[in-house]
Amino acid sequence: LIREIKTLPEKIEKILKDKERIQWFASKQVNAHDVFFVGRGIDYAICMEGSLKMKEISYIHSEAYAAGELKHGTISLIEDDILVVGVLTQSELYEKTISNMLECKSRGAYLMGLTTFGRYDIEDTVDFTVYIPKTDPLFATSLAVIPLQLLGYYISVAKGLDVDKPRNLAKSVTVE
């Protein structure tokens, strides 16, 4: 684990080399009204962080959903041009999540996929892909949230919003 931790800075730098592509993609999403993030297992937790950042700084309605729950009502919200971001960092859940994303695409959704390098077959399914380096599953969240945070950041910048002072947010401090 210690060896893997030592590789994280280099892996983060590799992700940041893709920030211009993420910025370009974000500039195309400035008029989005809804963004849905879908994933399974730990990817669902990553989706919750991505959705939170999207809401907090871009003021776009955003929700995170467990991909396996899409058929329980959520799928009825999918319509033309809604952005659906699929997080697919776990190889054992990859095919199931892709299947859920295809259901969204069949209803007109615009798909972004976030997966690990080497999973280039995703480009046959999604409209835009961001890759992260493979890492120990314990650290996947540390890498996967970066492109999602950048997406929210660059959408906010493209909208002319002050990302350093989001409206209606306050820091919480507990004094005992």
Tell where the protein language model's regions lie, with residue ranges.
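A SIS-like phosphosugar-recognition module
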Residues: 1-176
